[in-house]
């Protein structure tokens, strides 16, 4: 049943390109053991995102990935050949920076999901650590997801793709997109003049630097990585206190202003 449902969703999601967000352009199939924290987030309407397992009960994703009837798969690689240890969960609770789920392109695009039951760690399931410090400009980081590998005329793979990109100075994204504030709680990442980056279906997935989740895929250009345009990622380091407070039981904790 899972195979049929997910295969249909990968077709359906293309008609929802404006509702979901940003697959990996310019990457290659991930090694089956390098994305143990990567979650597939979807619903029966065809909306598709990714998430990041940070412990047995909690998944991080992007606020704009919130959807009704959310399903979360962990330990998945090829949707046509399920792994024996893959698990399906649904949200028990969802937490956002603001009660009305308000977020912008440069602030608070983050969602913390408590699973309905703990996920056992296994060969294909393991958590990713929260950052101990913010990444520095020039850092080489890893992106991954089931997002489109071409844009426009998106095609969606049955396996997650991975690629390496660099942390860029925020001014690069300001120059590319304009109208961004002088400061924001986002990271700018990509490879100038090369078409490598996140795309449709990758939203909510990780930007991994030095083995830690430094960013959450938020948004990028349309078409994806047009003329080598960088992508924008929620800066997880700025939200670590909020994340730890929520997980620790302080469900009224507020995000940084």
UniProtKB/Swiss-Prot annotation:
Tissue: Expressed by the venom gland.
Protein name: Snake venom serine protease rhinocerase 4
Species assigned in the record: Bitis rhinoceros
Residue ranges occupied by any Peptidase S1 domain in the UniProt entry: 24-248
Annotated InterPro entries: Peptidase_S1_PA (IPR009003), Peptidase_S1_PA_chymotrypsin (IPR043504), Peptidase_S1A (IPR001314), Trypsin_dom (IPR001254), TRYPSIN_HIS (IPR018114), TRYPSIN_SER (IPR033116)
Subcellular compartments: Secreted
GO function terms (MF aspect): serine-type endopeptidase activity; toxin activity
One GO BP: proteolysis
EC number: 3.4.21.-
Keywords from the UniProt entry: Disulfide bond, Glycoprotein, Hemostasis impairing toxin, Hydrolase, Protease, Secreted, Serine protease, Signal, Toxin, Zymogen
GO terms for cellular component: extracellular region; secretory granule
Propeptide residue intervals: 18-23
Record's signal peptide: 1-17
Function: Snake venom serine protease that may act in the hemostasis system of the prey.
């Amino acid at each position: 049943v899972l195979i049929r449902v997910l295969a249909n969703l990968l077709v359906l999601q293309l008609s929802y390109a404006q509702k979901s967000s940003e697959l990996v352009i310019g990457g290659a199939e991930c090694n089956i053991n390098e994305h143990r924290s990567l979650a597939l987030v979807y619903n029966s309407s065809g909306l598709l995102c990714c998430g990041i397992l940070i412990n047995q009960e909690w998944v991080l994703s992007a606020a704009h990935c919130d959807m009704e009837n959310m399903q979360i798969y962990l330990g998945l690689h090829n949707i046509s050949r399920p792994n024996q240890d893959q698990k399906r969960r649904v949200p028990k609770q969802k937490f956002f920076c603001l009660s009305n789920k308000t977020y912008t392109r440069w602030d608070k695009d983050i969602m913390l999901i408590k699973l309905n039951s703990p996920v056992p760690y296994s060969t294909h399931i393991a958590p990713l650590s929260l950052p101990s410090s913010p990444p520095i400009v020039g850092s080489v980081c890893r992106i991954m997801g089931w997002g489109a590998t071409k844009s426009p005329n998106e095609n969606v793979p049955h396996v997650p793709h991975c690629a390496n990109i660099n942390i860029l100075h925020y001014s690069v994204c300001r120059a590319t997109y304009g109208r961004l504030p002088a400061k924001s709680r986002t990271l700018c990442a990509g490879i100038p003049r090369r078409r490598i980056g996140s795309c449709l279906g990758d939203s909510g997935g990780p930007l991994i630097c030095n083995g830690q989740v430094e960013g959450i895929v938020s948004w990028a250009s349309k078409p994806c990585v047009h003329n080598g345009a960088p992508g924008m990622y929620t800066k997880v380091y700025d939200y670590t206190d909020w994340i730890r407070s929520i997980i620790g039981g302080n469900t009224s904790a507020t995000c940084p202003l």
